[in-house]
């Protein structure tokens, strides 16, 4: 790893905390002993005196071949692109026992993440008919929190959105502490909920769907008597239109106005996904003389959490950029915990359908701290009873297999681990 450079952390100006309610909400004063979560406050809250850890997260979706999102729903094992359900335990757990009674060795990715210093996992897709308690329980055992995702499907006007009021209760129950989605409260591993991913890139839903879905979610929580304190984010890309002063300000201006989610502001966090260097993020955005995070917080009074942050290996300076991003983020979060809650490095493993090996030249697929190989660690044989997301007899789940592959470390592995564990 290259020698680390100290980053100057800007101090807040007089307008740094325009909304004192938001600041108080994310600055609690009491910690549950040994639990790392706050008593009576949102799970993201970090107190002024007993400061909970800055979230050092990782984006996690390390499917092996032949996974491809374009045809994942044609299979039982990859249906819904859900990495966290029970049948995926051969990837993230130490072992997996099928309903057939057979036990298979696991790749144990969650343990690897723990050893890297990760304390937050960001997921992308979640099928509410699946069971996820094993994954969530394992995260609790390892001291790792989870950003539980609402897949794009549920926000798309031509897919799940019109039926959202019937679908949302099932999603909420699938985030519960019940073994078969039958709990009465959110699982303790869940630190927050993220809805969708980058609507500006997929062009498949808008800020209007984000707003309406969130309102209906909160109303469903009340009806179901679930807690109404989990923070909610809406991940967006880092593109900037000609009319914007800074990336995604137009999106948030609408999302947070009176007719949308202004009344839920204290429940929200902003979740942009930059690839920019630390200088832009924390010191000088758009030649303004101040960093993006500081100015965005001052503008909206809502804390930020980067749900993706990284640089692909195709860029010649990617290692220096990643190192600066991580060090700058942790330093700024320590200095301004009310503004900046954490980061999720993008990502644990390359996208296997774009980068089946380290030698790939695809920029979108080569962000991983690990690369895939052709070495199969184990072949897992499933039986139909291992799957809960299908409506038999209309779906064939016979002879389904998963072949966890050996992962190899990339240069960013040492950078992330070195910084996260310091």
Residue ranges and their predicted role:
Residues 206-322:
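Noncatalytic carbohydrate-binding groove/subsite architecture in carbohydrate-active enzymes
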Residues 87-113, 167-175, 245-257, 329:
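Short, acidic/polar
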Residues 18-50:
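N-terminal twin-arginine translocation
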Residues 1-21:
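N-terminal secretory signal peptides
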Residues 171-208, 233-238:
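Active-site groove signature of glycoside hydrolases
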Residues 50-139:
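Active-site-adjacent substrate/metal-binding segments within catalytic domains
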Residues 346-422:
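Aromatic-rich peripheral "rim/lid" segments of glycoside hydrolase catalytic domains that contact
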Residues 105-157, 211-230:
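Aromatic-lined substrate-binding rim segments of carbohydrate-active enzymes
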């Amino acid at each position: 790893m290259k020698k680390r450079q100290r980053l100057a952390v800007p101090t807040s100006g007089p307008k740094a905390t325009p909304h004192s309610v938001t600041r108080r909400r994310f600055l609690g004063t009491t910690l549950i002993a040994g639990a790392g979560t706050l008593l009576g406050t949102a799970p993201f809250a970090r107190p002024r005196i007993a400061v909970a850890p800055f979230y050092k997260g990782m984006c996690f979706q390390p499917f092996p071949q032949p996974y491809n999102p374009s045809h994942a729903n044609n299979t039982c094992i990859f249906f819904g692109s859900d990495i966290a359900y029970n049948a995926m335990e051969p990837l993230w757990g130490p072992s997996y026992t099928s309903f057939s009674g057979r036990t298979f060795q696991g790749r144990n990715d969650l343990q690897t993440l723990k050893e890297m210093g990760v304390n937050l996992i960001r997921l992308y897709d979640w099928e509410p008919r699946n069971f996820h308690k094993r994954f969530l329980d394992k995260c609790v055992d390892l001291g790792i929190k989870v950003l539980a995702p609402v897949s794009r499907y549920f926000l798309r006007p031509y897919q799940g959105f019109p039926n959202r009021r019937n679908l949302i209760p099932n999603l909420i129950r699938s985030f519960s502490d019940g073994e078969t989605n039958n709990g009465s409260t959110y699982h303790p591993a869940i630190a927050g909920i993220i809805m969708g991913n980058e609507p500006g890139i997929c062009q498949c839903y808008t800020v209007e769907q984000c707003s309406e879905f969130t309102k209906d979610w909160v109303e469903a929580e009340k009806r179901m008597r679930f807690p109404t304190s989990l923070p909610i984010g809406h991940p967006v890309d880092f593109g900037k239109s000609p009319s914007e002063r800074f990336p995604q300000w137009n999106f948030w201006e609408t999302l947070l106005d009176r007719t949308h989610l202004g009344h839920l502001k204290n429940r929200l966090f902003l979740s942009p996904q930059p690839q920019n260097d630390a200088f832009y993020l924390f010191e000088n955005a758009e030649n303004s003389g101040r960093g993006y995070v500081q100015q965005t917080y001052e503008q909206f009074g809502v804390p930020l959490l980067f749900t993706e942050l990284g640089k692909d290996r195709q860029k010649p300076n990617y290692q220096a950029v990643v190192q600066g991003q991580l060090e700058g983020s942790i330093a700024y979060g320590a200095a301004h915990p009310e503004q900046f809650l954490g980061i999720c490095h993008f990502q644990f493993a390359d996208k296997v359908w774009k980068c089946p090996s380290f030698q790939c030249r695809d920029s979108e697929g080569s962000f991983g701290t690990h690369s895939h190989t052709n070495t199969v660690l184990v072949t897992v044989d499933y039986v139909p009873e291992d799957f809960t997301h299908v409506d038999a007899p209309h779906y064939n789940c016979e002879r389904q297999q998963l072949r966890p592959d050996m992962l190899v470390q990339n240069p960013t592995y040492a950078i992330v681990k070195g910084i996260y564990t310091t």
